[in-house]
């Protein structure tokens, strides 16, 4: 059974009842709930009678409690070190916890949380992505990683396919399944470069808990400033510099000068949370090598 097959299937009426019964959040007559996009979970935007907004998150039936606990802990850690504006905050349930439990019509148990709402438009829908906005993105990720420094949780030290530090295992396992010979040859060539030039130096780089998924639909923007980031489901204890690498990888897409976009993001990150000499040297070496691969 896949994660999608275990996704929750609650109606908007049931979501309103969960918010009320578990968290004491009474949805107003004109406040939704409004379903939000999600493949494996179920999210609803709520508004109460006073206009206050929150997001109800009903987890996949396969989601581990410990991972949600780790996410909530990270959100609270960030708030205590950099203020609550960077990311949503878990709201307290009637029983004093921040994670409740509900049972679906199929009998499966789902963990449920209520998070504060952050206003903003997804970066993907904000144009143009000029140097200032990309540097702002990098700066935001730097502030986030700085706020996450010192946070840890056993559940985040996990085997996870989207962790860049574990990329060699994932690519090595699946590259032979690429049907197109040309694509497979390209991946094998790049993978060979990665194994020889990059992998040996990763272990010595700075490690810590990272967000891990700064894609342009998770990053929110308001008035040309990054207002927050969503979806901490890919959090993992990994290479800290992977966070800015992921943000830069999304930022370069469809850009006429992709390396310029990367430079803008990295510059903003470095100004907010300086990269170490070893991290900069590794990036320079990989970039120089990749241009000749």
List each language-model region with its residue ranges.
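An alpha-helical support segment within catalytic cores of ATP-dependent transferases
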Residues: 11-26, 150-153, 168-212, 274
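ATP-binding glycine-rich phosphate-binding loop
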Residues: 25-47
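Active-site acidic catalytic loop and adjacent metal/ATP-binding pocket
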Residues: 39-49, 55-56, 90, 195-242
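A conserved alpha-helical element in kinase catalytic cores
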Residues: 58-109, 126, 131-135
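A cross-family kinase active-site recognition segment
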Residues: 94, 125-185, 205-207
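A glycine-centered beta->alpha junction motif in the catalytic cores
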Residues: 96, 108, 112-126, 169-177, ...
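All-alpha amphipathic helical-bundle segments outside canonical DNA-binding/catalytic cores
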Residues: 132, 275-287
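Active-site activation/catalytic loop segments of kinase-like enzymes and analogous catalytic loops
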Residues: 241-274, 288-293
């Amino acid at each position: 059974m896949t994660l999608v097959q275990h996704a929750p299937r609650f109606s908007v009426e049931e979501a309103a009842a969960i918010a009320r019964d578990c968290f004491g959040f009474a949805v107003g007559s004109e406040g939704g709930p409004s379903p939000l996009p999600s493949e494996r979970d179920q999210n609803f935007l709520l508004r109460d009678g006073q206009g206050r907004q929150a997001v109800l998150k009903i987890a996949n039936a396969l989601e581990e409690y410990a991972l949600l606990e780790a996410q909530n802990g990270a959100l609270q850690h960030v708030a205590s070190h950099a203020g609550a504006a960077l990311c949503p905050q878990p709201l307290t349930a009637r029983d004093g916890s921040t994670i409740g439990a509900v049972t679906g019509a199929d009998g499966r148990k789902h963990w449920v949380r209520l998070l504060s709402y952050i206003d903003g438009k997804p970066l993907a829908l904000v144009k143009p992505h000029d140097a200032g906005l990309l540097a702002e993105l990098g700066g935001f990720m730097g502030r986030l990683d700085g706020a996450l420094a010192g946070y840890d949780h056993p559940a985040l030290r996990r085997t996870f396919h989207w962790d860049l530090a574990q990329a060699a295992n994932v690519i090595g396992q699946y590259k032979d399944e690429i049907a197109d010979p040309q694509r497979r040859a390209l991946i094998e060539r790049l993978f060979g470069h990665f194994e020889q030039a990059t992998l040996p130096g990763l272990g010595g780089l700075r490690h810590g808990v990272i967000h891990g998924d700064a894609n342009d639909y998770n990053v929110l923007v308001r008035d040309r400033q990054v207002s927050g980031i969503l979806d901490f489901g890919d959090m993992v204890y990994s290479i800290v510099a992977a966070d800015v690498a992921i943000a830069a990888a999304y930022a370069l897409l469809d850009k006429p000068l992709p390396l310029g976009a990367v430079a803008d993001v990295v510059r903003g990150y470095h100004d907010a949370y300086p990269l170490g000499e070893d991290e900069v040297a590794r990036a320079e070496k990989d970039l120089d090598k990749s241009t000749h691969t």
